[in-house]
Amino acid sequence: MIKLIVSDLDGTLLNSKQQISDRTLRAIKQIQRKGLRLLINTEQNYFDAKKLLDAYDISCDIACFGGSCIFDTSGDQLHASYIPTKRIPEMLRIFGSCRTFYEIHSTRGLCVLGSKEGYANYLSSEVVPALREEFPSQTLDEESYICERLENAHFYDNGQLLLSENPQIIKIKIGRASCR
């Protein structure tokens, strides 16, 4: 007997407009009414995936960062695979030699080494154009997108300040880099 259905989010549940179609939503609701558990697997972080699913009133388990973290329907973390703490300083040193922003996804949420203004510029000049290229049929409100990213990020002047808070690091995502 089937007890759990697992689905990818991007390109599977989400259509080319990055939306869940009415037909797919009805199927999800029917599955859940039958008592089957639904697990959404995504490369996205938990907060972005949860926000999207909440917009469609879908309550389910979420495996984010490609399965590195798993959360239940209540938002409780069931599993996490972190980057070993002893490796983080060297990684930050290497990434710090690159002329780009990088996003550090941790138990504190999204962390950025640098200023809000610099990160906003990075989002505007690199991330938004890349999203528009990848999803040409999707309408993206650049100002809202950037404001939301800035509101949800924690900013640090350097890696030592971040590491002094002892967060568990899940993923470090580096932008287009020009390393020295």
Predicted regions and their residues:
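Short loop/turn motifs at secondary-structure junctions
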Residues: M1, D57-S59, Q168
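Short, Lys/Arg-enriched, disordered terminal segments
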Residues: M1-I2, R33
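Asp-based phosphoryl-transfer active-site loop
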Residues: I2-Q18, M91
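An N-terminal domain-start capping segment
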Residues: T12-Q19, R132-R149
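Active-site phosphate-binding/coordination module
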Residues: D22-L131, P136-S137
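Alpha-helix-centered segments that form part of catalytic cores
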Residues: Q138-I170
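Active-site rim beta-loop-alpha module in soluble metabolic enzymes
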Residues: K173
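Conserved small/polar residues in nucleotide/adenosyl-binding loops
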Residues: A177-C179
